[in-house]
Amino acid sequence: MTTNIHDQRILILDFGSQYTQLVARRIREIGVYCELWSWDVEESDIRDFNPDGIILSGGPESVTEENSPRAPQYVFDSGVPVFGVCYGMQTMAEQLGGKVATSTEREFGYAAVQVTGESALFKDLEATQDVWMSHGDKVVEIPSDFVKIAETETCPYAAMANEEKKYYGVQFHPEVTHTKNGMKMLENFVLNVCGCEGLWTSASIIEDAVARIKEQVGDDEVILGLSGGVDSSVVAMLAHRAIGDKLTCVFVDNGLLRLNEADQVMEMFGNKFGLNIVHVNAEQRFLDALEGESDPETKRKIIGHVFVDIFDEESKKLKNAKWLAQGTIYPDVIESAASKTGKAHVIKSHHNVGGLPDDMEMGLVEPLRELFKDEVRKIGLELGLPYNMLYRHPFPGPGLGVRVLGEIKKEYCDLLRRADAIFIEELHNADLYNKVSQAFTVFLPVRSVGVMGDGRKYDWVVSLRAVETIDFMTAHWAHLPYDFLGKVSNRIINEVNGISRVVYDISGKPPATIEWE
């Protein structure tokens, strides 16, 4: 019998913290299903969701300001355990009779917290804990039925608890890795206080997804746009496991892929895994549509429109295809809901976030829409996809279309593909590939004088780009060894006829973006 992986669940109310999705990912890592909703959710929605516990996230607002966000009163009337983090602790204190004040000393960074009392939250943890603080306000008076369970030198109430009602608040962020035992605190809350078990595993997620796809589509056929990226690849494997040859994958080679990528996709999914794939070689069609266009945003739109047109044409050839499978993941759903309503809300509503035509008369199959990217990768491994494919660096949707600056020509793409392949190969050879978050090569539409043998040449310039980042919102340029960069440069100039100069991009984000276009 299939495990009901949604049987136990945690609700996270989002007050706007940059770390809120990280809280959700941590709960999933513990093995428990959770959803992320906006703080101003309706009481009826919480009641219908029936959570085993509620977490109130951090946020940028001040509890002391008029009209700042508050948790719905039902959170405290529902009888379920509640865990307030940073702003979540402050609003809990304020709403239950305590006091919050703006602090003269803003605490940001590492802090040593002294545990001052026994609590289920700090079970099996030592008296001093290294934590990550990020707050201006602080609780100066806790509600009368709470006790202090931790403090710092500058924060008298670093944590508070009402053990009887199972309410807990911490002024720090247990979800970030900087809080050394933060994961243990979250485990104590989710597993011990809320009584959840670890039902949410890669194997059980796959089992659930396969059963749902079978139930949803019955004997109908399904079509999927397979790009070779992580999300569509995992959807392909799940759907194939569920319905076999009733799945048709459409792989569009737009001429903007990495070196040999089209062959690799066909070899892996067609030959190795035996999926039914329609391979559309549309390089010339994309190049014709892009001819003369140099504006980055317009290039993106053209690439998107041509892909949609081709996919539409191919889907019409499959008369029995009633369903469209998409690689929508949970952050897409949250972002899509937030952009439409101003708030992240329930996962069940269907947003077509893939940009495919609205007049496509097909049902949507989205087996990943509850999953974060790290979860998608883990189930990909479980399904037999290679590690190197699942954990390779991000590649933009428009591909080389935004890595060839200015107008796109086949000559430029071919040169860039070969130069980029050398850079990536050398990163692997030097054991540096997994030490940077993203690395790639950019083609610059400018010529530079070079010397080859006794002759001069006047050829193109490429830039190498490598960054280190945690969340891709900000990034540092990677300080790769000079000897390594020299080796890559020499190989590119000697092996790629048409490139005379290699430069290295040392811009951080901000002010620069990671991609050049």
From Swiss-Prot:
Residues 200-392 form the GMPS ATP-PPase domain. It is an enzyme of class 6 (ligase). The active site is at C86, H173, E175. Its EC number is 6.3.5.2. It catalyses: XMP + L-glutamine + ATP + H2O = GMP + L-glutamate + AMP + diphosphate + 2 H(+). One of its GO terms (cellular component) is cytosol. It comes from the Bacteria. GO terms for molecular function: ATP binding; GMP synthase activity. Pathway: Purine metabolism; GMP biosynthesis; GMP from XMP (L-Gln route): step 1/1. InterPro entries: Class_I_gatase-like, GATASE, GMP_synth_C, GMP_synth_GATase, GMP_synthase, GMPS_ATP_PPase_dom, NAD/GMP_synthase, Rossmann-like_a/b/a_fold. Keywords: ATP-binding, Glutamine amidotransferase, GMP biosynthesis, Ligase, Nucleotide-binding, Purine biosynthesis. Residues 9-199 form the Glutamine amidotransferase type-1 domain. ATP binds at S227, G228, G229, V230, D231, S232, S233. PROSITE patterns: GATASE_TYPE_1 (PS51273), GMPS_ATP_PPASE (PS51553). It holds the Pfam family GATase. HAMAP family: GMP_synthase (MF_00344). Homodimer. Catalyzes the synthesis of GMP from XMP. This is GMP synthase [glutamine-hydrolyzing]. It comes from Aliivibrio fischeri (strain ATCC 700601 / ES114).
